[in-house]
Amino acid sequence: MSVFTPLERSTLEAFLAPYDLGRLRDFRGIAEGSENSNFFVSLEHGEFVLTLVERGPVQDLPFFIELLDVLHEDGLPVPYALRTRDGEALRRLEGKPALLQPRLAGRHERQPNAHHCQEVGDLLGHLHAATRGRILERPSDRGLPWMLEQGANLAPRLPEQARALLAPALAEIAALDAERPALPRANLHADLFRDNVLFDGPHLAGLIDFYNACSGWMLYDLAITLNDWCSNTDGSLDPARARALLAAYANRRPFTALEAEHWPSMLRVACVRFWLSRLIAAEAFAGQDVLIHDPAEFEMRLAQRQNVEIHLPFAL
């Protein structure tokens, strides 16, 4: 189970008291998390999720709270931070920054179809539309410079075939980092995977885990999302799912010609980002009782993205 900081019941009860949500009925750790400690918390007045933030600078946490408030106010199904009776949203528990949020209904969709991807495309378009007019600035701590640094560090330890795949991808990232094209920007979720979306029947009911959120190119966020939701087990893209996601997104925000030009490379960049972070996690947590996602999944996806046949619709 990926709970890095276990909790005693009495400690949790004392922490929850200022929210005035009634007595604690039950709580349990959430196994799916791979970076933070998360708990389902059942109180007299409802169901909640408690997050202890294990990674990232504490000074960034007000950004996440403000972003979730903005998205909640715009009607997106997100888990905004609850306040105590004194108005506190960000607190500390067992020495870690802690947030209490409503628990959203629904379940993860492990085998999405075109309808699910359409819903996800519309959601991401809504998220970008809600923030592009007033972007809350926060550079990603796993952006292009991070990819270049970590790629260079990891490459010598990779098998020859993997190094041969990574080297041209890093060269492409270096060129993109130097160019910094004027692609449209907004706030990004930057981790919109299947395990961060909840469906209640056929309807999308929630978007969770914003702890990689940042500001940046909307196209990059779209590439991250499509790479997970529309990939087959061999890493190739499923045309029906991909076109459904892109069309729904484009209904919220039409694409530009510059975005169409950079689309294939952005899909590759998004693969590299998660291939590297998974390789790092696999080394750091080897032998520990922590959920580790398979790095090979994104190695396969990067190999499949060398030729991209799914283009952006309605590019102007």
Swiss-Prot record:
Enzyme class per UniProt: transferase
Entry-linked InterPro entries: Aminoglycoside_PTrfase, Homoserine_kinase_II, Kinase-like_dom_sf, Pseudomonas-type_ThrB
Pathway stated in the Swiss-Prot or TrEMBL entry: Amino-acid biosynthesis; L-threonine biosynthesis; L-threonine from L-aspartate: step 4/5
Reactions this protein catalyses: L-homoserine + ATP = O-phospho-L-homoserine + ADP + H(+)
Keyword Kinase attributed: yes
Source species, domain of life: Bacteria
E.C. designation(s): 2.7.1.39
Recorded GO MF terms: ATP binding; homoserine kinase activity
Keyword RNA-binding belongs to the record: no
Keywords: Amino-acid biosynthesis, ATP-binding, Kinase, Nucleotide-binding, Threonine biosynthesis, Transferase
GO biological process: threonine biosynthetic process
HAMAP family: Homoser_kinase_2 (MF_00301)
Database matches in PANTHER family: AMINOGLYCOSIDE PHOSPHOTRANSFERASE DOMAIN-CONTAINING PROTEIN (PTHR21064:SF6), AMINOGLYCOSIDE PHOSPHOTRANSFERASE DOMAIN-CONTAINING PROTEIN-RELATED (PTHR21064)
Family: Belongs to the pseudomonas-type ThrB family.
Protein's recorded name: Homoserine kinase
Upper classification of the organism: Bacteria, Pseudomonadati, Pseudomonadota, Gammaproteobacteria, Pseudomonadales
